[in-house]
Design a protein with these regions (language model features):
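NAD(P)+-binding Rossmann beta1-loop-alpha1 motif at the extreme N-terminus of oxidoreductases
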Residues: 1-53, 57
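Residues at the starts of beta-strands that form the adenosine-phosphate
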Residues: 2, 25, 100, 127, ...
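Rossmann-like NAD(P)-binding element
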Residues: 49-76, 81
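Internal alpha-helical scaffold of NAD(P)-dependent oxidoreductase catalytic cores
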Residues: 122-206
């Protein structure tokens, strides 16, 4: 497939490298000359939007704040299939409504950015959401699912709304919490004593601020709802601490419940099974948190997470 990758940072660069290694005809596009020079050692590059016309697929990996310009200017008149890698999905669907668009989001990344941080195996074994709406062209969706599974990703069907709600809770909120933890611990002695717990809990606070700004701009309502849920949980913990003298087991029970839920992650996959590539089968798979590992002509090899009994 002839694929244009627009934006050659960590995610776009990694996708371009992986696709090139898989034998696809990759064209990189980036407005930054230094980035183009670095990428040119691996695949052809251009800074001219006119050069994208001969490609079959455009993978938009530009920062969120630039998506509107990419849709209206860089891809003006583009007739190929378009997908993106943004961490929010409802807003890109609106911006690219005039294109043949299927939203996507690879659940992979690092706290470092730029083409220098890109690696072709970044997505291997990682989940890659592909948005499946009632009006999504199933042929386009399947073509993208086949493409991303071919570089080792596990494709999860989901609606944009379902994705954005989940992403707010397992990704965007974590950036907010990491920044808050850094701010709470900003004392000389605390910083000297900080070790594993602080490092693990604050790792993503080292990410570029622009990354989080895109999450806020594109998913603010869901992020506020998730922040409210977190505040409620912290309020519960605070009440348990206040009641510790009279009810010392309450905070332990709160921790035990969280520990049990954490022990169930990541979910254990069931045996792989073939499913038809129909809208109904894919939607049902995504609704239970399942994913595709191999896409064939009319069927796909899929897995579902094991649901543990609560009895």
């Amino acid at each position: 497939m002839r694929v244009a990758v627009i934006g050659l940072g960590l995610i776009g660069g990694s996708a371009a490298l992986a696709l090139a290694e898989a034998g696809h005809d990759v064209l990189g596009f980036d407005p930054d000359p230094a980035t183009r020079d670095a990428a040119a050692a691996h695949f052809p590059v251009t800074g001219d939007p006119a050069g994208l016309a001969g490609t079959e697929l455009a993978v938009v990996a530009a920062p969120f704040r630039h998506l509107a310009a990419v849709a209206a200017e860089t891809l003006d008149g583009y007739t190929g299939l378009v997908t993106d890698v943004s961490s929010v999905k409802a807003e890109p669907a609106r911006l690219f409504a005039r294109h043949r668009f299927v939203g996507g989001h690879p659940m992979a990344g690092k706290e470092t950015a730029g083409f220098a941080a890109a690696e072709p195996d970044l997505f291997r074994g990682r989940k890659w959401v592909l948005c499946l709406e009632a009006d999504t062209d199933l042929g386009d969706w399947t073509a993208l699912a086949a493409l991303w599974t071919s570089i080792g990703a596990h494709v999860v069907p989901a609606t944009a709304a379902a994705h954005d709600r989940a992403a707010a809770r397992i990704s965007h909120l974590e950036h907010l919490v990491a920044a808050a933890l850094v701010r709470v611990a900003d004392e000389p002695l605390a910083r000297t004593l900080a070790a594993g717990s602080f490092r693990d809990g604050t790792r993503v606070a080292a990410s570029p601020t622009a990354l989080f700004a895109g999450m806020v701009e594109g998913n603010r309502d869901e992020l506020m709802a998730a922040a409210d849920d977190l505040a409620a949980e912290l309020g519960t913990a605070r009440r348990h601490l206040d009641a510790y003298t009279d009810w010392p087991s309450s905070i332990s029970e709160w921790f035990d419940e969280a520990r049990a839920r954490r022990a169930d992650w990541p979910p254990e996959p069931l045996a792989a099974q073939r499913i038809p590539l129909t809208r109904e089968a894919l939607a049902e798979l995504g609704a239970v948190g399942g994913w595709l590992e191999v896409v064939e002509s009319e069927v796909a090899l899929a897995r579902r997470p094991r649901v543990k009994s609560t009895s």
